[in-house]
């Protein structure tokens, strides 16, 4: 069995998320179907992260197992041909050791959350960013974001459906910056809880709108209670940007 490392870009708007589902289109399912049509047998795919419905990928790392021999370039070209017209692209492909695993070998993950902060409706960015009309103070948001960095119990920022054994995670990086009418929030950690990034972003927007202070963010964190959460940001603005090995 040959294992290939893939870098995958995708527009998550019309998918049920990364993970294969019994009903509905998914990124994993689409790539496995494309691989099976090339190899003539199942081609299991695993990824560094499992994104939700509507979440996008700029550079998701995955691996695919193929029994037949392909050069990486030929496999990449064949997968891309069969993935059309779905908004999924294999950006790179390389053969790796069969023991290497896209998920379990990963030591860090990075996400980007994009907010368009303006009154006019979104056109080109619709479904690819969160449209927030009320003005946001990015500097205040960044100050509050720093309250979350470090080793914490993130129960408040964890989905009730999260399957992680422990709510304790180390958040290595959380940064907020404004570029024109766009606000970019970047987050990095070894791993994240289900909905953790979107939950943190939702609370940061409350801070940016003046409804919360940085102290309120700390209070929510220390509550270790989902009821203390402001709200979840929508999936539209979330992008998986990098897996670190």
UniProtKB/Swiss-Prot annotation:
Enzyme Commission no: 5.4.99.12
Keywords assigned: Isomerase, tRNA processing
Record InterPro entries: PsdUridine_synth_cat_dom_sf, PsdUridine_synth_TruA, PsdUridine_synth_TruA_a/b_dom, PsdUridine_synth_TruA_C, TruA/RsuA/RluB/E/F_N
Biological process according to GO: tRNA pseudouridine synthesis
Annotated Pfam families: PseudoU_synth_1
Substrates-to-products reaction catalysed: uridine(38/39/40) in tRNA = pseudouridine(38/39/40) in tRNA
Binding annotation for substrate: 111
MF (Gene Ontology): RNA binding; tRNA pseudouridine(38-40) synthase activity
Active site, UniProt feature: 52 (nucleophile)
Enzymatic class: isomerase
Coiled-coil ranges from the UniProt annotation: none
UniProt family annotation: Belongs to the tRNA pseudouridine synthase TruA family.
Oligomer status and interactors: Homodimer.
Function: Formation of pseudouridine at positions 38, 39 and 40 in the anticodon stem and loop of transfer RNAs.
Name this polypeptide is given: tRNA pseudouridine synthase A
Protein's organism: Zymomonas mobilis subsp. mobilis (strain ATCC 31821 / ZM4 / CP4)
Gene this chain is encoded by: truA
């Amino acid at each position: 069995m040959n294992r290939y490392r893939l870098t995958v870009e995708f527009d998550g708007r019309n998918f049920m998320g990364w993970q294969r589902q019994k009903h509905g289109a998914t990124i994993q399912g689409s790539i496995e179907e494309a691989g099976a049509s090339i190899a003539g047998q199942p081609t299991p795919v695993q990824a560094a992260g499992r994104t939700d419905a509507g979440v996008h990928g700029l550079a998701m790392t995955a691996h695919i197992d193929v029994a037949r021999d392909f050069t990486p370039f030929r496999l990449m070209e064949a997968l891309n041909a069969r993935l059309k017209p779905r908004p999924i692209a294999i950006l790179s492909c390389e053969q790796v050791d069969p023991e290497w695993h896209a998920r379990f070998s990963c030591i860090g993950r990075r996400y980007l959350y994009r907010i368009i902060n303006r009154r006019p409706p979104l056109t080109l960015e619709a479904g690819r960013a969160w449209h927030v009309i009320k003005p946001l103070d990015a500097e205040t948001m960044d100050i509050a974001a720093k309250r979350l960095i470090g080793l914490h119990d993130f129960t408040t920022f964890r989905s009730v459906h999260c399957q992680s054994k422990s709510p304790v995670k180390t958040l290595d990086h959380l940064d907020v910056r404004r570029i024109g009418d766009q606000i970019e929030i970047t987050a990095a950690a070894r791993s994240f809880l289900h909905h953790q990034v979107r939950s943190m972003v939702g609370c940061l927007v409350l801070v940016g709108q003046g409804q919360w202070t940085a102290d309120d963010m700390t209070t929510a964190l220390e509550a270790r209670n989902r009821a203390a959460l402001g709200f979840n940001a929508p999936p539209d603005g979330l992008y998986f940007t990098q897996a670190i090995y």
